Amino acid sequence: MLENWFAPIAMHQIVRAPLDAWQLGARIRVHAGDEFPSLKGVRLAIVGVGASDADAVRSQLFTLGFPFEGLKIADLGNIRNDNLSFLIPVLSELIQNRILPLVIGNDLYFGLSLYKALAGIVGQLNLVLVDAEIPFQQHSTQERNEAFQALLSSKESGLFHLSLLGYQTHYTSPETVRMLENMNADLLRLGMVKANLPEIEPFIRDGDLQLVHINALKQAEAPGQVNPSPSGLTVEDSCQICRYAGMSDKLKAFGLFGFRHEYDHRNATSQAVAQMVWYFFDGFYHRKGDFPASFDGLVEYIVELKQADYPLTFWKSQKTGRWWIQAPAGTSDNPQRHHLIPCSYADYKMACQDELPERLLSAFKRFF
């Protein structure tokens, strides 16, 4: 039973004043006493790892508004044991019951529990990571890097594709970048993300799992982290990224990591993380269900490209206007849900001009 795995939340310590009916903390099911919340109809579940840090986020999150009529969310409380082997079966049970776990943890290392839980269910998966640093640095002795390195080095890890967003070149070894480029990973530096935020939406839409590290935000926006940087994303950038993630029909798990309450200043970071969670909820609430389980509701566009040996097939959702490109034929050995690669209208227009973005050329290489 899940209730045995979670410690309840002390609501009187988290929320000092009574909540109004319009506020989020009064509208979701909270594990706040002896009775564990019913998960019937629940679609999102908050899981805290590191009670003091997760509770600091809750104190800000619960006071925000709840305009998500009909969306059932549960806060299960804080995990009693933060060992990965303890976390994985809990998260697996949620995912298998079609409940998306949203983990708030104080270290990115706990993101591995989400990864392993999901990989055990879906097999090969696409990982989207938002981080100022690359936690795959070669020859690093840090435990976090060694753990994530195992995802790249083992064929049994289940990693089909990696998208790394917002990393900063001055924190990254060139050798690591070359290694990931050779793996056809999507690598978007901080400047590329900030230059055109809407164009990163297809990268996010392709993820089965998204992990966001708070160190992707600049220190002025989020001081409550271990190694803050003067450069990084703003809270507005991060909230938009989280909203894109929530809107993705393909996404099955999500985590926000790296917040440390003891380093925070006037609750700036806990407020930022709470807003990021809120915008993830907002994206989830506005899901359109247009991830192509079938081609119904999609318009087909075929583009003949001189530099390609085959025509390119684009698909556009009539419901949302979002775009996909179909992986080339002869790639049936790969997971079917990965065969439609999210793209943008700008990608389609480039193809019509006999050009294909490097990103899509790289994406095709995954299938050969």
Which residues are covered by each model-predicted region?
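Conserved alpha-helical scaffold segments that buttress catalytic/binding sites
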Residues: 2-256, 260-368
